[in-house]
């Protein structure tokens, strides 16, 4: 009997119950599943249909007591009871038939004693449960953000139709990974990491703990990416709710503290933070990961093969491509169209090929925004794209940049 501990952190998500149902219904051996759920809920949500199911271990948290994604995931890990395997998810997924057998077989195919298989999952639309793609994704590093994290993009794995086993990876995603159960004990989630940075932390820390990273060679799980129809943590943890004493701290302070910890762990800066048990492992070193993945954190370099998505390992320190070596510091003002009744305004800067060079998510309206960033590619246009209070995107407006 191969038991699987399914970890789900859910925040006010109407897709939680449909995700659980599909996970159970599509498993070949649903009797071997156990669920660890951190259920960060409001007053109208219900898990009543699973109340008497002994496969479920649920941490019940009112939404305003939550401290963020990785805090929830750290609590879930403590619910592990020796299951041979573990699958970590978000709370909005769909599954292939017999997904449990497929993932166990993938781990065996790697030939590794400590494999972790994961990536950005495929895409689905909850309306009609439409699965939007078949091709499996790899995670490709695009650039370092100003906060010190890496922005990743999904890319279809080249030649995936002919692949028969998982491929080596330099990154895995927190919203979908499958590994041996003792990862719950060995990789302790840092509860102080808010949201951004979870993936690079998961990747480098697992690697230094001796885990070998892989992407699945076929699509097994789908994910809902648009966030439409659900409240996000940062929607609730705002200044108004702090003033009304509904929450203790705005999300951006949690995020700032989180990124300082992350930069210290990645050795981008030394800020005297004591990471305790949430630092790197000792089986491999920080430098081992840099050479394997083609990344230099302190100088924020990406190897050209890393940027291109070539399968690792790189093992080449003689031909680094410093994205900022030939970079230019850009600073210019943009006039934001008057916007009312919005939840967020996406402001993006793109080059002539449509690559995102810089991004700002506005949660408060300003009529003039000063953009400051570095890039070795010339900005071509900026994008204004607001989201309304019901999580619907307004029309996107692209404006060619002429003042730089």
Please identify what each model-predicted range represents.
Residues 2-281:
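Catalytic cores of eukaryotic secretory-pathway lumenal/extracellular enzymes that build
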Residues 130, 152-164, 169-178, 229-404:
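Terminal low-complexity segments of carbohydrate-biosynthetic enzymes
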């Amino acid at each position: 009997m191969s038991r699987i501990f399914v970890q789900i952190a859910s925040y006010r998500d109407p897709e939680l119950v449909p995700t659980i149902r599909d996970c159970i219904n599509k498993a070949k051996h649903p009797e071997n599943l156990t669920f660890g759920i951190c259920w960060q809920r409001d007053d109208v949500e219900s898990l009543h249909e699973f109340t008497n199911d002994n496969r479920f271990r649920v941490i019940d948290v009112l939404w305003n007591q939550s401290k963020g994604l990785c805090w929830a995931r750290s609590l879930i890990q403590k619910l592990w009871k020796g299951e041979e395997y573990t699958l970590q998810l978000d709370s909005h997924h769909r599954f292939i038939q017999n997904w449990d057998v497929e993932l166990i077989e993938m781990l065996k195919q790697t030939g590794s004693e400590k494999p972790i298989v994961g990536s950005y999952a495929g895409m689905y639309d909850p309306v009609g449960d439409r699965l939007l793609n078949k091709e499996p994704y790899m995670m490709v590093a695009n650039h370092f953000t100003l906060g010190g994290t890496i922005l990743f993009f999904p890319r279809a794995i080249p030649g995936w139709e002919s692949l028969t086993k998982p491929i080596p990876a330099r990154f895995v995603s927190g919203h979908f990974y499958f590994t041996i159960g003792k990862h719950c004990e060995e990789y302790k989630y840092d509860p102080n990491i808010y949201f951004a940075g979870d993936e690079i932390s998961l990747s480098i820390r697992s690697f230094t703990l001796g885990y070998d990273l892989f992407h699945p060679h076929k699509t097994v799980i789908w994910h809902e990416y648009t966030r439409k129809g659900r409240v996000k943590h940062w929607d609730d943890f705002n200044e108004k709710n702090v003033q009304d004493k509904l929450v203790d701290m705005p999300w951006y302070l949690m995020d700032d503290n989180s990124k300082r910890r992350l930069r210290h762990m990645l050795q981008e800066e030394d800020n005297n933070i004591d990471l305790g048990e949430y630092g790197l492992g000792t089986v491999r070193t920080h430098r081992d990961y840099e050479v394997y993945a083609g990344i230099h954190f302190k100088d924020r370099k990406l190897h050209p093969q890393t940027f291109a998505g070539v399968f690792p390992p790189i093992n080449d320190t003689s031909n680094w491509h410093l994205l900022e070596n030939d970079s230019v510091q850009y600073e210019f003002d943009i006039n934001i169209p008057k916007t009312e009744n919005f939840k967020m305004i996406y402001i993006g800067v793109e080059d002539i090929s449509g690559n995102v060079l810089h991004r700002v998510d506005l949660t408060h309206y300003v009529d003039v925004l000063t953009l400051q960033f570095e890039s070795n590619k010339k900005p071509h246009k900026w994008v204004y794209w607001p989201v309304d209070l019901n999580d619907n995107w307004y029309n996107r407006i692209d404006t060619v940049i002429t003042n730089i």
